[in-house]
Amino acid sequence: MSAPRTLYDKIFDDHLVDRQDDGTCLLYIDRHLVHEVTSPQAFEGLRMAGRKVHAPTRTLAVVDHNVPTTPDRAEGIKNEESRIQVEALAKNAADFGVEYYSEKDKRQGIVHIVGPEQGFTLPGMTIVCGDSHTSTHGAFGALAHGIGTSEVEHVLATQTLIQKKAKNMLVRVDGKLPAGVTAKDIILAIIGEIGTAGGTGHVIEFAGEAIEALSMEGRMTVCNMTIEGGARAGLIAPDEKTFEYIKGKPRAPKGEELEMALQYWKTLHTDEGAHFDRTVVLDAANLPPIVSWGSSPEDVISVQGVVPNPDDIADENKRTSKWRALDYMGLKPGTKITDITIDRVFIGSCTNGRIEDLRAAAAVLKDRKVASTVSAMVVPGSGLVKEQAEAEGLDKIFLDAGCEWREPGCSMCLAMNDDRLKPEERCASTSNRNFEGRQGYKGRTHLVSPAMAAAAAIAGHFVDIREWK
């Protein structure tokens, strides 16, 4: 009888092509997602070597990082570098026979939102993309992680990847979430607990009652930010919610193929007694709505808290780092989080750009107005999310409140397109990173949930969504 295995062990073993004596492994890759920023050199490498894409039907190309989100984007991309990258992806996809969703295709959107909604992402698969937030797809019980540009070329050419097996880490969130606390708060709390290096060298499996209670959208939010916790990939075991989400998706198996797939998918869970190298347990009942205060995703605190004093930190290097973060953010120790005023609000990204996220923001904004001192932008994560939101009338709620309603794309999550902060502008953002300059030169980012961002847009400062009337 074989030893009990974790979910990660099972998927890894099922895709193992070869293992060397030093632990170096060759894994088969089921799905490869491609976007315009990390793929040009990879395709050029294939072209120069006279190689083909090994499995074009297992590859999907989507433009997302550089595309404008303004209504006039059909007129073209003004920034030359961005335009060249987008044009290169279109040409490369055509030359190598890879399916491509351009900015004119309603299926276009952020690659990590497009994959699941197309049924391209399925349980038990290995999935890679030249993007660190590929961990999002782990919400389906898939082993998914980002890869570098040279690895993109390797996967295109061979449909395999060289890597060493990671350690197993379990993060269990027990109990029920209080009202007003969301998947975004769960993952921010986890990162606050373990730090941005806490998962280094591990694949994290998220489990527990609070995780199981999340919708698929919520699970994607949690897995999306696994990389901010230091782990390359995050996993959640698939269940009936997963299967129902997948059924009927364009690329999902159907009929007898679906029945066969379900038999396999139902084996994708950690065996009782399987070994984890590290376990972290959180109590969902104690989790508050969370706001980041510094320039790292681990710099988080309850909305009812105050900006911490770095002098309370014993480690000199960490203390210096946190003082630098406060200086960059223009904040002082002891400041109440609810006293921090904001200039901008960004609702979107591969973390929180799905229909559930937009519904949560719209529920707060309905029949209210964005503060006169705040500029708010809502960017759906895909053309299909946009279509669904408009069918539900969410766009009208956003526009009536004074928000901008945009076209799909990565937008203000990162300063690679026209959506960016000006120096020292402060933004309540539903994205995943608050690094220096992430949303624009000297821009100040606070990471929050969609409902918290919407409430801040109305109040002009952070508020506790649990007390929102």
From Swiss-Prot:
Required co-factors: [4Fe-4S] cluster
Keywords annotated in UniProt: 4Fe-4S, Amino-acid biosynthesis, Branched-chain amino acid biosynthesis, Iron, Iron-sulfur, Leucine biosynthesis, Lyase, Metal-binding
Gene Ontology biological-process annotations: L-leucine biosynthetic process
Enzymatic reactions: (2R,3S)-3-isopropylmalate = (2S)-2-isopropylmalate
Family (UniProt): Belongs to the aconitase/IPM isomerase family. LeuC type 1 subfamily.
Entry-linked NCBIfam families: leuC (TIGR00170), PRK05478.1 (NF004016), PRK12466.1 (NF009116)
Functional summary from the UniProt entry: Catalyzes the isomerization between 2-isopropylmalate and 3-isopropylmalate, via the formation of 2-isopropylmaleate.
Binding partners and assembly: Heterodimer of LeuC and LeuD.
Protein's name in the database: 3-isopropylmalate dehydratase large subunit
Organism of provenance: Allorhizobium ampelinum (strain ATCC BAA-846 / DSM 112012 / S4) (Agrobacterium vitis (strain S4))
Gene from which this protein is expressed: leuC
